[in-house]
């Protein structure tokens, strides 16, 4: 017992939250929750990286879409909404970074905790659906270029984007009920990334429904679109075509995001919830610890899409790279006259000072 207390103090954990433990409650007996030291360093490190790169990348993307990408194409509408979802999410990361550096002691209140988890899930499933829209848009443009001319208009993309936002907010709204804060035995405050044990059974059902309808089905649609896109690129005469290049980039980037960020997160989240519900025997505690630790890793990976998406705009967007280069050149040209005028002003001031002092050697 003494060794457990010392280990808990060194790792910033509670005795009842040590790995591999077996806790006896008033009514039930179950494996104790894992709270290992790596979580306090891995997650904030990942979130700092995502915040810096995601904030800069999505700020530039939004600036480009608003000021330099007019008039928008249909795919630009989807990409702007994707950038907006990512930008809103990265704005919430500083509070989460502090939370983990503070040994997961939440100080911002229950409402902010609910909002934090709500925005994460809105970004997660909003990004998945907007990537699906982008993929379907590219599929129709490559595989059915003539039939899709009317369907790819900007107005239709605006309608679809509005529907996506409404759908995501409606589906994710229950998170505002399930998430929240809780008080640990040592009086610190936790901000649940899923939910408290008392709501776990119903949350598992809700989580499975969102996984199927907001992840699995869009992923199947994307795989189908990309399979047909690759087939069209192979059999159609699109050599050296910008559309061919952008389509290849789109396939590679989106599939990478799903393979690295979305798929591992949903698999491990489901397994972790199932372990909390049904794998509560002494023989399963060590397995549960590994599941929980892996789930924490995938939580960090799930946030990486917010800093990867700007690469998608740059490589697969309509004229994004060319217009970004043009915008930066314009900015540099505007700064050159300012530098020159400042230099002339400094020279004039120096000459005036010398003349006032009676020095005419210049």
Curated annotation (Swiss-Prot):
One of its GO terms (biological process) is cellular response to purine-containing compound. The keyword Transmembrane helix applies. The keyword Membrane applies. GO terms for cellular component: plasma membrane. Keywords: ATP-binding, Cell membrane, Disulfide bond, G-protein coupled receptor, Glycoprotein, Membrane, Nucleotide-binding, Receptor, Transducer, Transmembrane, Transmembrane helix. It holds the Pfam family 7tm_1. Glycans are attached at residues 11, 26, 102, 186. Residues 1-40, 99-114, 178-203, 274-292 are extracellular. Brain, spinal cord, gastrointestinal tract, spleen and leg muscle. Is not detected in the heart, liver, stomach, lung and kidney. It is a multi-pass membrane protein. ADP binds at residues 35, 192-194, 272-276, 292-295, 299. Disulfide bonds join 31-285, 113-191. Residues 64-76, 137-155, 227-249, 315-362 are cytoplasmic. The chain crosses the membrane at residues 41-63, 77-98, 115-136, 156-177, 204-226, 250-273, 293-314. Its main location: membrane. GO terms for molecular function: A1 adenosine receptor binding; ATP binding; G protein-coupled ADP receptor activity; G protein-coupled ATP receptor activity. It is found in: Cell membrane. PANTHER family: P2Y PURINOCEPTOR 1 (PTHR24231:SF2), PURINOCEPTOR-RELATED G-PROTEIN COUPLED RECEPTOR (PTHR24231). Belongs to the G-protein coupled receptor 1 family. Receptor for extracellular adenine nucleotides such as ADP. In platelets, binding to ADP leads to mobilization of intracellular calcium ions via activation of phospholipase C, a change in platelet shape, and ultimately platelet aggregation. This is P2Y purinoceptor 1. The lineage of its organism: Eukaryota, Metazoa, Chordata, Craniata, Vertebrata. The gene is P2RY1.
